[in-house]
């Protein structure tokens, strides 16, 4: 399970700067959810082969009324949800009473605490870090978040006991497709989970997942195995009212990362809101297959339906690869159709791609529309091969590949998606500049390549297309 690192500290010690550094200056993936304290940001970061969620807790201000004023409400919850805590102090300001109060609270959390002294650039690091040993939190790691100083060393320490992401085991595969049902509060996630489990389900067992409060529910439908990652709390303890849907951003992000396919539920009555788009952005960043379900569709009149469809076509162009379903989870309308899209997306995301066919598609794409010139020289794209699954990663080798513009990458994605018949999954491209392995041979690009779909009639070896998934 992808771990969570909470950034904690007084205002202006550099939490947001470090957050942007770790997430490569991307905006918060999820922001401004109702019920969250100001300025809390959530993002995903990588260090080598390790991935983790970063939380900029915010909301720690003032020094007069004790720890409750610094870490009220959602900030305390973020620390509670986190697997690790980075306590950031200002090396230039030095140790303050507020730092000592925060440290006193953190010592009771029973979590790994890492003390980071920020802003050590231009000063004697050992001298400015020395006072913070008084906090009793162990070693002090000096960093300069604004300039990236010691960030990699700090991450080596923080992530030392975090395991790299592992491939799915045979045991996990036997449990079937993992579905994460995600969405804003009160869009109908609980109702959809119950409807998908249905009266004809075969529930093997319900067990708490390693994600706090998420439940992994194994079941069968039409002889096929599935595991729903339930973040909505439909099976919580009886003393928690089911009408009050708990919402945890960390829990949602972890569910997305652990899933094979994500069903994003939206409320048709409210239309598309920014929070929906933020969640979609995280699904794409995570490389997960996506199915979009617009719930409560039966509550709309025809004029409202027409307006919502227009808005969908306008605002969801960046996820036009995902199937869109209009459903009523309460009455079951359209819910069964979700499974066909789930299988189609899962098959596309996990299909093994043939190197020969990928190179033929690349040759065809280049013949139809060549890459641009860079400094008077044409970018050369020579061959392609698969680099991974879930999402499909296509590695393209050539010359000057670092200069391939984004609009040409979008063109390549369109061609590869069409020829590979990939539905419901993002595609990743990796470009590598390298020596041509076919040097000395006749360049296959010197003659106009035929369309990949006509390969079977070319006299060469046919490359079978991926079989279409059965619904």
UniProtKB/Swiss-Prot annotation:
It comes from the Bacteria. InterPro entries: G_ENGA, GTP-bd, GTPase_Der, KH_dom-like, KH_dom-like_a/b, P-loop_NTPase, Small_GTP-bd. Transmembrane segments: none annotated. Residues 3-166, 177-350 form the EngA-type G domain. GO terms for biological process: ribosome biogenesis. GTP 2 binds at residues 183-190, 230-234, 295-298. The keyword DNA-binding does not apply. Keywords: GTP-binding, Nucleotide-binding, Repeat, Ribosome biogenesis. One of its GO terms (molecular function) is ribosome binding. Residues 351-435 form the KH-like domain. GTP 1 binds at residues 9-16, 56-60, 118-121. Residues 432-471 are annotated as: Disordered. The keyword Nucleotide-binding applies. Belongs to the TRAFAC class TrmE-Era-EngA-EngB-Septin-like GTPase superfamily. EngA (Der) GTPase family. GTPase that plays an essential role in the late steps of ribosome biogenesis. Associates with the 50S ribosomal subunit. This is GTPase Der. It comes from Saccharophagus degradans (strain 2-40 / ATCC 43961 / DSM 17024).
């Amino acid at each position: 399970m992808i771990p969570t690192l909470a950034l904690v500290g007084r205002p202006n010690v550099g939490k947001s700067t470090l957050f942007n550094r770790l997430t490569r200056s991307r905006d918060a993936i999820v922001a401004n959810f109702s019920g969250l304290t100001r300025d809390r940001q959530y993002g995903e970061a990588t260090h080598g082969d390790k991935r983790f969620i970063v939380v900029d807790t915010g909301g720690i201000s003032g020094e007069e009324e004790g720890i409750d004023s610094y870490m009220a409400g959602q900030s305390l919850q973020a620390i509670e949800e986190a697997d690790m805590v980075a306590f950031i102090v200002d090396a230039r300001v030095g140790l303050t009473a507020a730092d000592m109060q925060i440290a006193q609270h953190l010592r009771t959390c029973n979590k790994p605490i890492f003390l980071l002294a920020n802003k050590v650039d231009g000063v004697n690091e050992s001298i400015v870090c020395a006072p913070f040993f008084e906090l009793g939190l162990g070693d002090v790691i000096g960093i300069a978040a604004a300039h990236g100083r010691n960030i990699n060393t700090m991450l080596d320490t923080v992530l030392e006991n975090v395991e790299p992401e592992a491939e799915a085991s045979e045991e996990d595969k036997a449990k079937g497709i993992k579905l994460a049902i995600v969405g804003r509060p009160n869009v109908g996630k609980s109702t959809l989970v119950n409807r998908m489990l249905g009266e004809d389900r075969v529930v093997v067992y319900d067990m708490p997942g390693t994600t706090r409060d998420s439940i992994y529910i194994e079941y069968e439908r039409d002889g096929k195995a599935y595991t729903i990652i339930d973040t909505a709390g439909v099976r919580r303890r009886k003393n928690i009212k089911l009408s009050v849907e708990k919402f945890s951003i960390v829990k949602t992000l972890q569910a997305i990362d652990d899933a094979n396919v994500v069903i994003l539920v939206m409320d048709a009555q409210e239309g598309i809101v920014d929070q929906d788009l933020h969640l979609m952005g995280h699904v794409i960043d995570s490389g997960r297959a996506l199915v979009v379900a617009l719930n409560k569709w039966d509550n709309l009149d025809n004029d409202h339906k027409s307006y919502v469809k227009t808005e969908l076509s306008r605002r969801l162009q960046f996820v036009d690869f995902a199937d869109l379903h209009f459903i009523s989870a309460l009455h079951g309308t359209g819910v069964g159709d979700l499974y066909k899209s789930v299988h189609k997306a899962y098959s596309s995301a996990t299909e093994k791609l043939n190197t020969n066919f990928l190179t033929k598609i690349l040759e065809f794409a280049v013949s139809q529309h060549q890459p641009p010139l860079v400094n008077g020289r044409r970018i050369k794209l020579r061959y392609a091969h698969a680099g991974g699954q879930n999402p499909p990663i296509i590695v393209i080798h050539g010359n000057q590949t670092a200069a391939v513009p984004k609009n040409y990458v979008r063109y390549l994605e369109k061609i590869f998606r069409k020829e590979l018949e990939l539905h419901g999954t993002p595609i990743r491209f990796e470009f590598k500049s390298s020596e041509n392995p076919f040097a000395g041979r006749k360049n296959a690009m010197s003659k106009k390549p035929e369309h990949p779909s006509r390969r079977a009639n070319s006299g060469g070896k046919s490359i079978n297309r991926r079989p279409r998934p059965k619904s």
